[in-house]
């Protein structure tokens, strides 16, 4: 009996070790996948493949404490060569999704900075009003004028883009329309932006008037359950028995926002087999191309969206592509 118990004990101990090793290995794999997410997004198009890779710049990071408790800190990612060179770089400010902080998006924002952008994030977990984006621009203006700052006279304030995920969608729309620095925004990107159905339900600063966004705008979302839902219009209430679910950013919402946008260059597209949680990662290459096109005049990047045969119109991983160019 003692031998049997001893054998069982050994088996249990070995199993525990194996489980521990497995969990550690899975943890390392998950960490690596998050840090190198761009290797797992399955790029197909030539432009998508190019901008899914890291850019040519190493990336430096600097943090600033905010006087606003909701914002907490600002984190700025920038091309490391700015530590030793005097040149200006365009800007992208990022608006977090609900409950997310800057570190949720670290690898994603470093990727963007590696393509030549000064990228600003913060720890605001409720970004919808756009106030924290506006505060980020205040910080950039201050640092650009500060002779003691590593970013002194290196921030191209004439080329500012904003992007946001989920609740960050209303944030960028509100930043571009009602915040004090709205007139400094050159282009807007929103991935899985909260639909008007939900913003009306939530109230409290969630609502936005996208018809007042007067700069080029890219709208993206996934086709899976939480983003797409099953509802086909804002008029349908979620009804589990009837099989109706209002997704966070369904196709009808993309169509509605595209239609309401004024006479500006605009695009919407969905990626197949993608859902809300990591949609920002899945669209990263085309987001980078969008900002490169509008903030650095990268003509090749623009071919993803416009022209006789825009890449997104033929990329098999994407659907429902629609574009308008003046």
Regions found by a protein language model. Name each.
Residues 1-17:
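N-terminal Sec-pathway targeting helices
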Residues 2, 263-265, 271-326:
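Alpha/beta-hydrolase-fold serine-hydrolase catalytic core, especially in secreted/extracellular enzymes
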Residues 31-88:
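N-terminal cap/lid segment of alpha/beta-hydrolase-fold proteins
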Residues 83-88, 131-171, 178-179:
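Gly/Ser-rich "nucleophile elbow"/oxyanion-hole loop immediately N-terminal to the catalytic nucleophile
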Residues 86-97:
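Short beta-strand element of the alpha/beta-hydrolase
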Residues 103-122:
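Short amphipathic alpha-helix adjacent to the substrate-entry channel of hydrolases
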Residues 185-277:
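The feature captures the conserved acid-bearing segment of alpha/beta-hydrolase catalytic domains
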């Amino acid at each position: 009996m003692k031998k049997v118990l001893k054998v069982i004990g050994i088996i249990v101990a070995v199993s525990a070790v194996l489980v521990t090793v497995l969990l550690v290995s899975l943890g390392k794999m998950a960490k690596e996948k998050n840090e190198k997410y761009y290797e797992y997004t399955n790029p197909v198009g030539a432009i998508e493949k190019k901008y899914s890779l890291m850019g040519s710049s190493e990336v430096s990071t600097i943090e600033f404490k905010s006087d606003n408790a909701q914002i907490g800190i600002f984190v700025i990612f920038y091309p490391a060569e700015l530590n030793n060179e005097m040149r200006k770089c365009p800007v992208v400010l990022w608006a977090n999704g609900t409950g997310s902080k800057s570190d949720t998006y670290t690898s994603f924002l470093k990727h963007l900075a590696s393509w030549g952008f000064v990228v600003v994030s913060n720890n605001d977990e409720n970004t919808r009003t756009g106030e924290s984006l506006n505060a980020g621009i205040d910080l950039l203006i201050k640092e650009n004028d500060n002779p003691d700052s590593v970013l002194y006279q290196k921030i191209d304030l004439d080329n500012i883009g904003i992007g946001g995920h989920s609740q960050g969608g209303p944030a960028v729309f509100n930043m571009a329309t009602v915040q004090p620095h709205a007139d400094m925004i050159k282009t807007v990107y929103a991935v899985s932006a909260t639909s008007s159905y939900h913003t009306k339900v939530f109230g409290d600063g969630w609502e936005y008037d996208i018809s007042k966004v007067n700069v080029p705008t890219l709208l993206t979302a996934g086709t899976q359950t939480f983003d797409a839902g099953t509802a086909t219009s804002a008029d349908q209430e979620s009804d589990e028995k009837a099989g109706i679910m209002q997704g966070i950013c369904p196709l009808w919402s993309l169509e509605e926002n595209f239609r309401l946008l004024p006479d500006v260059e605009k695009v919407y597209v969905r990626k197949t087999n993608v859902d809300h949680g990591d949609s920002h990662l899945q669209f990263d290459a085309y987001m980078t191309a969008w900002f490169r096109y509008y903030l650095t005049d990268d003509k090749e990047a623009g071919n993803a969206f416009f022209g006789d045969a825009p890449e997104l119109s033929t990329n098999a991983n994407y659907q429902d592509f629609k574009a308008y160019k003046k």
